[in-house]
Amino acid sequence: DMGVLLDPISVMMLVVITTVSLMVHIYSFGYMKGERGVQRYYAFLSLFSFSMLGLVVATNIFQMYIFWELVGASSYLLIGFYYTKPAAIAASKKAFIVTRFADLGFLIGILILSFYTGTFDFGLLTADNASLAVPSLAGGSFLGLSAATWAMALLFMGAAGKSAMFPLHIWLPDAMEGPT
């Protein structure tokens, strides 16, 4: 089920995201003055903001993944904004490939987690309900590690790729080819 989760953490993140997004939009008026394709830039930037907002209010991990991918797509579009520059094209491709690799790990982690718990719902994946999931997650193993360990490691891999953490940080310096 799709929905909107408004708890104290998501509300705090909504305030942070909308404040930073507003500042970026305002700053962009001067930064992008005289540039060609300003409407396209604001469309990409707005898609990025919308995706971040959707990510933090998602009620389940699958809905979060949809917005997670939209963040990646809008990042790709923003990095490749100057599509006539070969360096911008190369940078956007590099970011796309590295983050898709990480996102694949994120997706596999989600699928492992949902397979063993039987749900995508955050409410059922919380500590209050962990006793329901722990026996099934601890039961399966691969290469000596439990299903829970694999799921969490793969989820972390996805987060590491999207946030440019080592060793999946290689795309970030090239991302400066887009409007910064």
Q: What positions do the PLM features span?
A:
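...captures the hydrophobic TM-helix bundle architecture rather than a specific catalytic motif
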Residues: 1-180
